Amino acid sequence: MEKKCRRCAWVNPEDPIYIKYHDEEWGVPLHDDHALYELFLLETFQAGLSWATILHKRENFRRAYEGFHPERVAAFDAAKIDALMQDAGIVRNRRKIETSITNSRVFLDIVHEYGSFDAYIWGFTEGKSIRESWELRITSPLSDRITKDLKRRGMKFVGSTSIYSTLQAIGVLAAHAEDCDWRQP
């Protein structure tokens, strides 16, 4: 008999994409700038929607956003915005699309300043994952501080809640539930 896995309560046990995301990505310390960029960009589109919606559109976003290369996205023009607005496979919100371009430029500025986005984002915790007690919270002093800095740099559609969620996803905040099989000791 196969042992049933215990996952964080937010995982829909009927959704294989969500399960795969939880089991293979969420909370795993992420240091690859390309993957970090993808998550930050997707988080822009998540505002007001469920993360499951974004995960189900992820491959469409990868195609529409040319493999999530920040240099390419930063150069998107009005014609590309219009084309994205016609793409039923992604979230078609003009403000979010325009924001994704602005945020890509800010992302590249941060990479230029710090050498990598990884150095920037993990620098807030001196490269260490912070153990979070598993409770229902949506922000933290750390997410507040990072949000304030990103906004100062010109990023849009970033709030402490979305940054908190991203910090959990990339492993800066280690937040698997106490009874989750993926929680690290």
Give the positions of each predicted feature:
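HhH-family (HhH-GPD) DNA N-glycosylase catalytic core used in base-excision repair
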Residues: 1-185
